[in-house]
Amino acid sequence: MRTASFLCFTFIIFVSQIVDNSEASFIIRRAPKKPLSPVIFVPGDGGSQVDVKLNKPSTVHIFCTKATKEYFNIWLNLELLAPLIIDCWTDNAKLHYDNVTRTTSNSPGVEHRIPGWGDSETVEWIDPSHAKQGAYFKSVGNMLVDNGYVRNVSMRGAPFDFRKGPSELGQYFIDLKKLTEETYDLNDHEPITYIAHSMGAPMLMIFFQQQTEAWKEKYVKRMITIAGAWAGSAKAVKVFAMGDDLGSLGLFASEMKPMQISMPSLAFLLPFPAVWKPDEVLVSTPRRNYTHSQLNEFFTDLGYPIAWEMRKDNLKFVENFAPPNVEIHCLYSTKMKTVEGLRYKSNDLSSTPELIYGDGDGSVNLRSSQACTLWRGLQKQSISTLNVEKVEHFEILHNEKVVNYIKDLMIN
Ligand SMILES: *[C@@H]1O[C@H](CO)[C@@H](O)[C@H](O)[C@H]1NC(C)=O
Ligand SMILES: *[C@@H]1O[C@H](CO)[C@@H](O)[C@H](O)[C@H]1NC(C)=O
Ligand SMILES: *[C@@H]1O[C@H](CO)[C@@H](O)[C@H](O)[C@H]1NC(C)=O
């Protein structure tokens, strides 16, 4: 059977060669493949490597490293996330907000860099040692390479400092435009397919809003988003209040919190008004409710008004939910318990709230991962969706249906 179908397949190729190329010689060649659209991966929150170099005036514990000659990887280096050492790590990874310049900087004596610009390797694997937990765009990347893509030529990566919000990432959008044009030139002027995860989706929305229609028609084939946090997530409210343990890495949310709440990206990712109504309750206490339009009061009462300052810096990006005007494929998951709100049993916001759950992928609420469909009828380019049920926000990157969908779109 197998032989028969193989022969039949060969025959079709042979005949089509003769028909297509009647003047050519009768040599059996493989049918010309459709040209591959080069890929640029755009990672999400936590999806890029971060290296630091230290020359610190002081450290939080005596055993913390004070100075290093070279840059070393801190994200996602699981050794540095061990108990005790995590305090050293937090001080090296966290940002400090300046409410006058409206920008963040590292702790004194910490220099950072995001390695691997243009390369796919550092977004295929977040952990340079390629530990299993650090697998990121690996499954999609391997599938593409198996089908003819070449790392660093037709498959690129656009990592960024995910700790920051778009208000501080202006240079990233400029660099992404350059990388797009360079990749287009490197690949016989084939338009680009962008593949984004999580926060990468709204980052690309902003990027495309900034480009002219002519530029997009020339350089952009499509965007594919996986678990896109298009319109933020209620989980960001939870992280500001309690921190997050990053799933099953054996970490404590409370230990991760000081680093996490210092990130303007977390304030950017608070629920967007595109899919949250102003009077929707996000946090409740016996005394009062905090609605979407009262998040600023929540952060004041939480004793962390900086969160709202960082949000204000990014409001113009959050509030402009205009269509990107490119072909979109939104791949997402549902039916995983996803935080929708917090309910405190006491009026003390330092107590532990009960989490209210709704539908989503465990991190991003369904209404946000589906928000791409709000642009149907508002842009002429098509918007397709794939819902894979019961797959977690990071696991979905390795989901067979997702990988096959991308394969069908890109290769077959
Ligand atoms: C800025 O920060 C300083 C010091 O933390 C604080 O005293 C001041 O009230 C803040 N200003 C604004 C506008 O938030
Ligand atoms: C990727 O390409 C760039 C520029 O073409 C080059 O500088 C870099 O070393 C390459 N990286 C790898 C891993 O080949
Ligand atoms: C908070 O909102 C809920 C509806 O979401 C309402 O039933 C409740 O009475 C409100 N609580 C307070 C204290 O206003």
Regions found by a protein language model. Name each.
Residues P264-N347:
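Glycine-rich, aromatic-lined ligand/substrate-binding cores of catalytic
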